[in-house]
């Protein structure tokens, strides 16, 4: 179900959920710069494949909220995605540095 999910988005989604388990879908969408519908789809898929689980909590007496918690499987996947994310960013950095150096050399 997540085969089409961008690896950077998948990583950022798991990282944000780990850092802010009580974040709302709306806030998650804003923080990651994607639509609310996309977040809803991704969260359902992450639950289906066992990367996260959903738990209820009462944030106040009149309101029911949810916690998104990474499972052991989700933590393993996040670790793998973190390595891939860092490798991609290092390559982007090296390419950008070469481009900057080339422009500076042409001045």
What spans do the regions from the language model cover?
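Short amphipathic alpha-helical interface segments
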Residues: 8-21
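Key DNA-contact positions within bacterial/archaeal DNA-binding proteins
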Residues: 26, 37
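Alpha-helical DNA-recognition elements
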Residues: 45-49
